[in-house]
């Protein structure tokens, strides 16, 4: 059986990981408790959006940390964006990406999610779901 745990939030600065510590207005802890009995993270579902307010080319990465990770901190790319020109009326939908992983974890311990972009391309929001088994 798979368990899905999500956190979301604003990515507030370039070249600095920002913790994802919200759940769409619901009361929750900042970190994710690994479901009891789970031994690994088997999937990542991630999406990111920006307002494209600043021209630039950015790569975006996610970082997992905490005592719920058997092998320590993990960092992986979740997207990229290029902005050239004005963002007037350029609304678009970004579908989430999925990534199959095999990250060992410790049941009932904690995992924190954070996201960073290497270049400021405007205000950014990210959401990441971890799939535990």
Regions found by a protein language model. Give the residues of each.
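C-terminal interaction-tip segments
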Residues: 1-24, 31-38, 44, 50-51, ...
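Positively charged, low-complexity intrinsically disordered regions
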Residues: 6-8, 27, 41, 64, ...
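Solvent-exposed, conformationally flexible loop/turn segments
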Residues: 11-27, 37, 80-94, 106-108
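Exposed aromatic-hydrophobic patches
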Residues: 29-31, 93-102
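Noncatalytic modules at the cell exterior or secretory-pathway interfaces
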Residues: 42-43, 102-120
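Terminal beta-strand-rich extracellular "head" domains
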Residues: 49-98
């Amino acid at each position: 059986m798979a368990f899905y745990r999500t956190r979301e939030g604003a990515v507030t600065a370039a070249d600095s990981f920002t913790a994802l510590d919200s759940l769409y207005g619901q009361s929750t802890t900042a970190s994710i408790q690994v479901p009891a009995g789970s031994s690994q993270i088997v999937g990542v579902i991630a999406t990111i959006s920006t307002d494209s307010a600043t021209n630039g080319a950015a790569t975006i990465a996610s970082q997992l940390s905490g005592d719920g990770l058997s092998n320590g901190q993990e960092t992986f790319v979740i997207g990229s964006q290029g902005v050239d020109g004005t963002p007037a009326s350029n609304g678009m939908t970004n579908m989430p990406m999925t990534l199959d992983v095999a990250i060992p974890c410790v049941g009932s311990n904690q995992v924190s999610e954070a996201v960073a972009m290497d270049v400021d391309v405007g205000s950014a929001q990210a959401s990441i779901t971890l799939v535990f088994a």
